Amino acid sequence: LMSKRTLEREAFGKKFSDFSNIRQEVAISKCEIEQARLLTLSAADKMDKLGNKEAKDIIAMIKIVAPDMALKVIDRAIQILGGKGVGPDTHLAHYFAIARMLRLADGPDEVHMYQLGKSVIRSYGKL
């Protein structure tokens, strides 16, 4: 939706897709989506092979990374779409609210970061 809109929307006589900062926002979004996707696949693989208990650190990483990524990408899409981004035609405002809620659904990010940090430090010696 965001990338398609860059080909349609114009400012100062140029398509959005011609602006380097817009291309950068699209590129960053693509990278963040792929990072979260690969982390999720890695976690699923670890869960399948070793079980959920052994995968708890990577599961915590996903619970931190995925909702945060979704918020950032949706926010960029809203920004690029302008007023249309918060209108009823795109549902982006609704998705933004859902993504924000997901950051709290299984405990706030800080809880996951605390536990993950503790686990990582413990793996290097007694805490």
Regions found by a protein language model. Give the residues of each.
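Alpha-helical interface subdomain recognition
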Residues: 1-127
